[in-house]
Amino acid sequence: MSLRYAYNTNGLTSHRLDDALALLADSGYDGVALTLDVAHHDPFAPDLPGRSAALRRRLDGLGLASVVETGARFLLDPRRKHHPTLVSADADDRARRIAFLKTCVDVAADLGSEAVSFWAGVPSDDRTTSWSWLVDGVTEVVGYAADRSVTCAVEPEPGMLVDDCDDWARLAAAVPGLTLALDTGHCIVSGRWAPDDAVRAFAPQLGAVAIEDMPRARHEHRAPGEGDMDLPAVLAALRDVGHGGLVSLELSRDAHRADTLVPAALAALRALNEGAPPR
């Protein structure tokens, strides 16, 4: 089967959003992973519903599907990266993150996006209390999204409270309707699952998928061919399980070379997929 590829806009921050979308479409991508941020579709700028309606028309005109990503570094706090989170100690801070995620759900509903992806946050020393906060927050967001027919997917992130797929499974058992946002590169940084095994084991629960190369045991997103990932095995697994959702390249530190990397990375993935035999 043919996989559907997208590219995360966090790797296109030197491009205006309209130019970035045109680059993706012209390069042959099927969609975009839209990270709501100061550079692209700022959710706190005026007239978000009107801008979302215009963006949907643009996406439809280019033939691009979408997922909404929520990992902006300084959108909520210009002085603390990725703060606040669902496990922040201050209740008002947690409420700010929940409100932001609900706004992202609204954007996803307006765009007709396939999913909204988000992560847990780095826990305090009291992991039991942090876990309780996480379950409460995710439950609230998933319930809000369900009323709007939007899929929520939590992404295991190395070093966060949901660090790997096993942590996600525990969370999903507590929050019905939650899906998995699987960044396959993270699997070789933490956890016991090989990336291709994770794809196969969690195929029915996949809400969003990201791919990139990555050095083993180091959380560095790299272009295909620049790390230790067995990308053919991951692509074969996605194909074997019949994954029909977007497979999003996340190269957030490569905006300076996006003009050449966007088409080159897609060509590399397609070549690897064509050479990946089914298992």
Can you describe what each PLM-predicted range is?
Residues 1-6, 13-30, 54, 60, ...:
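Histidine-acidic metal/acid-base catalytic patches
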Residues 18-19, 61, 75-179, 279:
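Active-site acidic/histidine proton-transfer and metal-coordination neighborhood
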Residues 39-43, 78, 85-87, 124-128, ...:
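A short acidic, helix-capping loop that chelates divalent metal ions and anchors anionic groups
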Residues 11-13, 36-38, 72-74, 120-124, ...:
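Active-site-proximal loop/turn and secondary-structure-junction residues that shape catalytic pockets
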Residues 1-104, 109, 146, 266-279:
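N-terminal pre-domain/capping segments
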Residues 44, 48-51, 90-97, 127-130, ...:
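Residue-level preference for long, well-ordered alpha-helices that form the structural scaffold
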Residues 65, 151, 244:
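Conserved H-loop
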